[in-house]
Regions:
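Extended charged low-complexity segments that act as oligomerization/scaffolding linkers
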Residues: 1, 26, 47, 142-149, ...
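Conserved catalytic cores of large enzyme domains
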Residues: 1-21, 26-30, 54-61, 136
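Active-site-proximal structural scaffolding
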Residues: 6, 22-32, 60, 79, ...
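Conserved kinase catalytic-core helix
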Residues: 13-50, 70, 182-184
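Active-site catalytic-loop/activation-segment of kinase and kinase-like phosphoryl-transfer enzymes
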Residues: 35-75, 150-160, 188
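Catalytic activation segment of kinase domains across protein kinase-like and atypical kinase folds
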Residues: 48-133, 201-214
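ATP/Mg2+ or Mg2+-diphosphate-binding catalytic cores
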Residues: 162, 167-170, 174-278
């Protein structure tokens, strides 16, 4: 997608943040998300391969090791995030009108070269993190949650249905958050290489990762209760097989409880529009 004339979206957003024009900022972000989604729809049939959680997790481990970080974040990921022709480092300044350009690889990718392909949601995470940078650099008082929501909604409006599904954004299995975590580590790696000081908001976001993970870990209590209730329901049926009408009451209650606990567990997953810094 070639870059045409006119102001880029990064400049448009910066002007909107400076003037405090929330509606204009949301319009720019929604358009950027839609342009990125259109790109992903165009390349969906060109080449996709199955998700690669082993290499993705190994990359996160490598970045953590490079930074000697005291953080560890791994995820099982979902089937709705296949590898595709990723744009890599995506910035709002890469979008002009209805086009998006392929930018240069970032320095961090040269210092820690990827040995894997990436899903579309990683491109989105790169764009969302660029929004966080611009929002922070301009000291904007506009609600970052609403701005992120506009960008994500724009992407969802044009991206392949499976790639932007609820499961793809499910934070308990990685979602958007874990790729934002990767973007923050890449920012820090570049800052260390350039000796340019602590990069914000990356450093602040990384400080909140542990609390974000703790919240998700605590949510697993409901997941465990769901599994236990299902186990007791199955055990009751097996022990009383073939069960009578009266004997079915208890297993049914266990199964209903299992479904209730599971739905509650899923509902506690942090929504993608809420930043890691707002989820603690």
């Amino acid at each position: 997608f070639a870059k045409d004339g006119g102001p880029d979206a990064g400049s448009e957003l910066a002007d909107s943040l400076e003037s405090g024009d929330a509606s204009q900022a949301k319009e720019v972000l929604h358009r950027c998300g839609a342009v990125l989604g259109n790109y992903h729809t165009e390349v969906e049939d060109v080449r996709t391969t199955p998700p690669d959680p082993r290499r993705w997790n190994a990359r996160l481990a490598s970045l953590e090791e490079s930074l000697r970080a005291d953080l560890i974040w791994r995820a099982p990921f979902t089937r709705d995030v296949p590898c595709m022709l990723s744009l890599g480092d995506v910035r709002l300044s890469d979008t002009v009108g209805q086009t998006v350009r392929i930018g240069r690889p970032r320095i961090a990718d040269c210092l820690n070269e990827p040995n894997c392909e990436f899903p579309a949601i990683r491109d989105l995470a790169s764009l969302v993190h660029d929004l966080s940078r611009i929002h922070h650099n301009h000291g904007s008082e506009l609600d970052i949650v609403e701005l992120r929501s506009s960008l994500i909604d724009g992407w969802r409006s044009t991206a392949p249905e499976d790639w932007c599904s609820t499961d793809a954004f499910y934070a308990h299995r990685g979602g958007l958050a874990i790729w934002e975590y990767e973007q923050c580590m890449l920012d820090v790696i570049e800052a260390v290489s350039n000796q340019s000081g602590a990069p914000e908001p990356a450093v602040t976001i990384l400080r909140h990762v542990r609390g974000f993970q703790k919240r998700m870990f605590n949510n697993r209590t409901l997941g465990a209760l769901s599994i236990m209730a299902a186990f007791f329901g199955i055990s009751s049926v097996i022990n009383q097989f073939p069960p009578s009408i009266d004997e079915l009451a208890m297993p049914i209650l266990f199964f209903i409880a299992s479904v209730g606990f599971f739905l509650s567990y899923r509902s506690l997953s942090p929504p993608p529009e809420r930043p890691i810094t707002h989820s603690v």
